[in-house]
């Protein structure tokens, strides 16, 4: 049983003793602290398809009403839908009930500001302080809040995607795509069919019932996607699409059943955006170098941010990035909003593929396959490892020593905004400590998986030798 309180929200497994799991008492306390912090009068609440979602929703909504807030309950909704709804409704904040890619027994509260964006680290820390202080003041009977059910925001989200200038509805419709989509038995099965209908895309949905009974591990990684990959290998589809339970992460599968590569979701969409809009890009330190290569090809500047969506969006605003995101399949397109959005990613990717296909036909070719599009990008491989430590280990001191070692060496660039990233001319390795476990996560990238894994293990040995 697990309960994790952090600056980004509260998450945990359902059931068990108070203080050890995500339970009604902690939900009340944390929701109250958020309401006290955010101020104002109106809060949007949306949830993914998790089994525990209704229970958590009822506690959250009742607590907000008890604090005097008027709640707009948008029902089953993706994370980006809820983010957009905050702005569209002119609300003071929002609560997303989702544990993203975590297994079915998990749930969480993710907290938004009035812009529909995640709270900053400082704001999240203040909510935690208020929750621990428990100095709460609830509304008197004549000042209790209300709850309004409004299920229009899924369609409004779709409409906003269709209105984006770079979403080429005509080219997509003419291409007559046929796609296979795994929506993991969550909210993607509700909203994505309507998006495909609006785009003129023929689709087949796998795991499309919004029951929260996930058909497989919900993280959209290759090891979890054999069902749709096998389906794609049977033929008849142009593209495979996979989303996580709250539809902020996106992975593609080529027409032959091979993975497009989760890291390359953002790379491919950025390449399309940059071909139409000059500008800069941002991703986090643990994301593929391919985004930098593509950005520089188009004359833009790439900047790395600390891991975490709020860090990426903050850096995007600083450098005026026209596209950004995270290598886990998260596409952030400011023309829509500052949040990871799989609907935006799908529409832009299909636009790119459709336009390339049209150009190919003009040259006497049959069009552009997804695998052919993937082959146009620089090819890198990322290895992921971890170093297990004892609770007594001073992780920060170890990372400082690693930084000093390579800074003195001069053979690589060293970045310490989030752990330590060591950037060599043809490869990189990133070490960062976990906020919840006594471990150091080790990400490394090179042109082959063997080279990437070897680099990661070399740095792991450096750390072991320091203990």
Q: Which functions belong to the PLM regions below?
A:
Residues 32, 36-37, 42-106, 194-253:
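N-terminal small/polar loop signature for handling phosphorylated ligands or for N-terminal nucleophile
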